[in-house]
Amino acid sequence: MKKIRHYYLAAVIQSALLAVASPVARAQDATTDGYVTRKEYEELKAQMLAMKKELDAIKKEKGAIPKQESAEGQAIVDMHKEVAPPVVEPEGPMLGTTKFYIAGWGEGMFEARNGSVSTFSASFNPIFLWELSPKLLFESRLEIEPSGSGTNVNLVYAQLTYLLNDYITLGVGEFFSPSNVFVERFEAQWINKLPDRPLAVYHGILPNISVGAEVRGGFPIGPTRANYALYVSNGPTLNTFDPRTAGTLDFSSYTDNNDDKAIGGRVGFLPVPGVEVGYGFEPAKPGFQGTTFAHVRSLVQSVDLDVTRDSDLLKGRINLYAQYAWSKVDHAVYDPDGSLGFGPLAFTSKRDGGYAEVAYRPTKMDTDFIRNLEMIFRWDHLSRAPSGLGAPEEERWTLGLDYWLSPSTVVKAAYEWDNPRGERNRNALLLQAAMGF
């Protein structure tokens, strides 16, 4: 830059000298006619050529500087490429590009039941949700609870789900049986409004868990809506060895006992917002392959109702849940040779049971304490064991009162009148605190 300034300074000085020298030359060689002499012309021409050469040299030197800087910059870029080559992004999802979430609940309970010692219990149920992509999801739940001197950890369900479109979802793995609405929707202890679970739909008639594949979804029908769930899974096992349970179905079959698979499902209809009715079914062959029970067939059916209403007259919200189920197993002969000590015993197995529950919460009251209370009444029923040698018919009536500390934290108190036919009562006081997260 100093050199450039010197060139400019030289040009200015030369111009000044030319301006001073010109009058002198003209005074010495001036002509009387006013024209420039040949000598003056040659001097001016020489000065102009010298100035042009100097300006060309300055321009050339200025143009070389950006080229040098550009070359240095390119060299730095090339060096970066050699030291840190570009990262190639993989086509599939990477850890950090997916979404992972933990939900679930924890609960503690006290139970004092007639005929049994009172006891405390607790459990923790984490639910793991993993979104591998907007269409591919994984969900799993564990049940962790103390047992004796150790801890029991049970896998409740684990399912991989693919969202095909707005109306069809595909799933495979271990999942809640769609025909059992209570287990699928209300089984979580911070959602279940009473400390214990109803008869029949939880244990006895309906399946809780299925291992297989399912397709489910929903769609509008004019102003109404409908939903569906269809599945194929390992079927139930027919109990044949114990007289108390002979003819009943065991749905805890994580491996099948024959090549025939259970095919079941549920269809729901919502005629108006807040009201849903449903029908569930599961036909199967529950007998062991290669035995006299191999061709015995079973059918489980259920109906359910779910109503939610806000009432200005009652200043609160009313919930009504109900489900009733029936199971039937074809005629069969149990212990045909008497080797088990209770046969031969021949019968067609039929059993039924269900529950109805109504809850009221005064959500429109002005006082916070009253708004957080909820009153519950439930009736549940289970018919006797089909063999006539097992559990008797059982009917229960339960009154409960809940206090909600937050939308997912509740303290419950309930008293249950439990009257198995022909046996002494098993009435119980139940207390529970549960928190969902």
Region spans (language model):
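Outer membrane beta-barrel
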Residues: 88-238, 259-263, 268-277, 352-365, ...
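Glycine- and other small-residue-rich loops at beta-strand/loop junctions that grip anionic moieties
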Residues: 204, 252, 256, 347
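Bacterial N-terminal signal peptides
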Residues: 10-20
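Outer-membrane beta-barrel pore domains
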Residues: 158-163, 171, 185-192, 203, ...
